[in-house]
Design a protein with these regions (language model features):
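Solvent-exposed edge beta-strands and adjacent loop segments
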Residues: 2-95, 148-163
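Extracellular/virion structural assembly segments
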Residues: 69-146, 175-184
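Short N-terminal helix-initiation segments at or just after the protein's N-terminus
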Residues: 18-37, 103-118, 166-180
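Mixed-charge, glycine-accented linear interaction segment located at domain edges/termini
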Residues: 143-184
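Short, surface-exposed, charge-dense and proline/glycine-enriched linear segments
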Residues: 6-8, 12, 100-104, 170-172
Length: 184
């Protein structure tokens, strides 16, 4: 559609339990499609696309440390990454009633995002997939990036006249799968 925004809504982004994937290096479409829609906290993978703030959410590889030393067999200017430097920050809109989890009518992605992002020391796979709208099923050929991360304390962002948000800057836990094509 000609009027569709450049950045959306063609991005799906969320979290998964570290126990969700049988093989984290080869996630399947079936595993990705077990998404609870972001409101079922008993699941193990959550789509938070509609709860995350586009302007303040980051899922990127920063400048990686590289080994620039060359042997006689390498081309000039070649550099091998020695350590990846992912930058993952999820900033979610706060729910109006974040503590109500027993009333299913009050649950939404903002509630789920708060409960997943507010606490320190929880490990997840942060994931992103570009190309389909939130809620669309994953299929063979779709691409997904995921990184194992750990939460820090969620930081509230409250300002006069603005939306209340919670921001989580994740710590990287060394497992990275970047732009992987789903094959099964």
């Amino acid at each position: 559609m000609a009027n569709e925004r450049l950045y959306g809504p063609k991005t799906r982004i969320g979290l998964a339990s570290v126990f969700h994937f049988a093989d984290w290096q080869n996630p399947t479409a079936a595993e990705m499609n077990e998404i609870s829609g972001g409101i079922d906290m008993t699941g193990s993978i959550w789509d938070l696309s509609c709860a995350l703030d586009l302007d303040n959410t980051t899922f990127d590889l920063g400048d990686s440390d590289t080994d620039d030393e060359l042997s006689f067999c390498q081309w000039a200017g070649s550099a091998n990454p020695t350590e990846y430097n992912p930058e993952i920050v999820y900033t979610a809109f706060r729910a109006t009633e974040p503590w109500i989890v027993s009333d299913p009518a009050s649950l939404n992605q903002a509630n789920a995002a708060f409960h997943l992002l507010a606490w320190r020391g929880v490990e997840y796979y942060a994931w992103v997939s570009v190309g389909k709208e939130p809620g669309e099923a994953f299929a063979v050929g779709d691409r997904v990036s995921l990184m194992r991360v750990e939460t820090d304390f969620g930081i509230d962002d409250v300002s006069t006249g603005g939306n209340s948000k919670i921001s989580q800057t994740f710590g990287f836990k060394s497992q990275i799968l970047w732009n992987h094509k789903i094959t099964a």
